Amino acid sequence: MDTTSSVDFLGADGKWQREMGTAVAEMAAVQRAAESIAGRVAGMVRGLPDMNLPIPNSEWTVGEAAAHLAFATLGMAMMARGLEIPYGDGTREGLAMANAVALEGFTERDGAVLADRLEAAARMVFDEARAQPPDRMCPTPMGTMPVETLASYLVTHLSMHGSAIATAVGAPWPFDADDLPLMWLFIAYVMPRVPDVAQIAGLNACFELQFGDVLDCALMVDGGAVSAALAPARPPDCVIAGDAQLLFLVIVKVLTMQGAIAAGDVTLSGPTPDLGLRLPDLFNVP
């Protein structure tokens, strides 16, 4: 696949950009992806007889994860409108506490009801986004971001939690490999904001990530700070390559790096390949 047509117009400033430099809102492709993913997740839970199934490597059940997706997606619709919704402090710990409080208050666990609410909320995000001025900035738990980045956040969030549900119910991943470029705006926005300070202390390294043939990007760790770009700023110390879907799920900790490597789905190379084993632990992905 030619990654130029998929990625080169994604600006690191949180805006979609054409090669001619004109900023445009490429929301149609993002909307199709988000609504498709939401529909697939809804299909996993709509007729599920036991919503109390535990999710592997998670404290949540399927019902709790589906409830989280339903109310969080509705929250994103309100954020797209420009409303500020206090919800944690952007840290993994703060968001975990906010999620726990929200799940106590939002008690719906019926799969059919949650499926309908999730699909409706995903549509609502884009209804709100279309009604906003092009320079709309949206307050979110991860900071204030352009509405285009919020839409990318939605695709990422649905893919991450939807895939966790898929591991519990034995369903296919709800997102496609071609959805990865649509997540780039949020990935570039959030990764510099969520490093584990203790883990990156004293580390200077450049990681090149190759998500199949759909997205190449890089994460640079220098002096306690992280930057993200579509190309490495210097020769990479470690190249992490693999199946686009599985590598994404490793980064967001739905799957483990060790398991993906053992299965042959991810490979590490470069001058310091073992650095790749540390990559997921360098970030507190919320």
Regions found by a protein language model. Name each.
Residues D2-A29, L74-D135:
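Short, helix-capping/interhelical loops that line the mouth of catalytic, cofactor-
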Residues A38, A42-R46, T73-A77, E119-R130, ...:
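Structural signal for well-ordered, non-membrane alpha-helices
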Residues R40-T61, G82-Y87, E128-P146:
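Helix-loop segments that flank and shape redox-cofactor active sites
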Residues P134, C138, V147-C217, D222-G223, ...:
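Acidic, aliphatic-rich amphipathic alpha-helical segments
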Residues E208-V250:
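Glycine/small-residue-rich hydrophobic helix-like segments
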Residues P232-P286:
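C-terminal interaction segments
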